Amino acid sequence: MKEKPIIGVTPDLAKNCQKYTYADFPWYALRRNYTDAIIAAGGIPILLPYQSDTINQLMELIDGIVIPGGDEDIHPKFYEQKYAEDLVISNEERDHFEILVLKKALEKDIPILGICRGMQLLNVMFNGTLIKHIPDYIRHFSKLTYSKKFECNTEAFATTVYTLPIKLEFENAPIKTIINHTQPKPKNIVSHTINIEVSTKLSKIANNCLQTMVNSTHHQAVNKLGNDLIISAKAEDGIVEAIEATKHKFVIGVQWHPEYLNDNGIDLQLFKALVKASKYI
């Protein structure tokens, strides 16, 4: 058993270099919260560069993997045949690299935590599909204000009470919701409730607290669930908030951003669970 397992993290790749830096070369981008969360959980983070010829050696080095979020969508060609090319905003280099990383990691049963876009990619890897734009899929109601107080008592976590205001808008779409899944800034604070399924890995990580609050900054979501996956949490409008694999030791995806380590009884515990699982590979 390793004292501090090595957790590989795939970065984003920025190519609009003239706007952001002094040299006209691509650069890797990764919010510090990811590495801070891994360190806080007892792991050592390392960046995984986009060189496919290094993958096999990296897989021998790392003990766990985090696939983080990002601004660009997974290209729909990876999960459906028909799509409008002019509506696609993606980073295919990142898609191809992360798919390769996940394929190798799943073959070796390396523990994986997918976050936001990372969860969506996990679903695609298991032959699932995505809702390409939530506002086209759900119906928001206008001229209403919704407040909810949430409270959960467990042995592990102190009681936390949240008051949640939600401003609602109307759109003509098939599913009703009161949740804005792309919350306004600040995007790190919790904004809506999720309901966790009993007897899942996620419920154990949350110490059997089956409801908590999370942040939300995504416009896509799981549509058709991938093979050998189960849904371990949903938002109150039915949008999938967490998935996990049934035939692997630790493969969990969450739609929110736990790297901000909100005091909600689950964010830090997710990273601790990943690090713990990574000690025993």
Curated annotation (Swiss-Prot):
The keyword Transferase applies. GO terms for biological process: polyamine catabolic process. InterPro entries: Class_I_gatase-like, Peptidase_C26, PuuD-like. Residues 19-281 form the Glutamine amidotransferase type-1 domain. This is Putative glutamine amidotransferase-like protein RP404. Keywords: Glutamine amidotransferase, Transferase. CDD domains: GATase1_2. The lineage of its organism: Bacteria, Pseudomonadati, Pseudomonadota, Alphaproteobacteria, Rickettsiales. Residues 139-174 form the RPE1 insert domain. One of its GO terms (cellular component) is cytosol. One of its GO terms (molecular function) is transferase activity.
